[in-house]
């Protein structure tokens, strides 16, 4: 099974001082966490937040952020998932459980994982509600 890493997981993997770095990096180092996927949304989110320095790190320079993404995507086991299918199609089974604007991206990433027969890897326990019973198998909550 392929794991689509959400943006928070991507950021934590770049910040050894983050409170969840150890459990996330331990999970990521396990062979069972491979293959792993990124998509345009998670890649651009990672770049944007590294540039802002929002993780507690100093803001990355543009080339540093690009290099960080290159290193990540060059790792063995990486798969790129394009943004297909369209948003409305991928969130159709999830849409009724969405509770607000903060879940729109999560819903799409979960829908993308479902479409690709994978799992969305996240720390966000609240996403279980969004998945419902029928999509619970498509979520990997990384324990902290």
Regions found by a protein language model. Name each.
Residues 35, 77-79, 138-140:
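Conserved beta-strand segments of alpha/beta enzyme cores
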Residues 86-99, 110-144:
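Acidic, PIN/NYN-like endoribonuclease modules and their adjacent C-terminal/linker elements
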Residues 5, 104-105:
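A generic structural signal for residues located within well-ordered alpha-helices
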Residues 1-38, 50-64, 132:
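Short, well-structured N-terminal submotif of metal-dependent ribonuclease cores
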Residues 16, 40-44, 67-98:
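Acidic catalytic patch
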Residues 10, 43-46, 127-128:
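A generic structural signal for short hydrophobic patches within well-formed alpha-helices
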């Amino acid at each position: 099974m392929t794991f689509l890493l959400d943006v928070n997981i991507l950021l934590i993997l770049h910040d050894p001082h983050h409170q969840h770095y150890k459990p996330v990096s331990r999970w990521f180092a396990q062979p069972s966490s491979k293959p792993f996927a990124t998509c345009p949304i998670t890649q651009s989110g990672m770049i944007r937040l590294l540039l802002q320095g929002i993780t507690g790190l100093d803001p990355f320079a543009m080339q540093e952020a690009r290099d960080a993404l290159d290193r990540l995507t060059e790792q063995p086991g990486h798969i790129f998932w394009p943004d297909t299918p369209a948003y409305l199609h991928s969130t159709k089974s999830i849409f009724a459980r969405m509770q607000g604007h903060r879940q729109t991206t999560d819903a799409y990433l979960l829908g993308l994982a479902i479409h690709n027969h994978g799992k969305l890897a996240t720390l966000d326990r609240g996403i279980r509600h969004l998945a419902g019973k029928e999509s619970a198998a498509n979520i990997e909550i990384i324990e902290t």
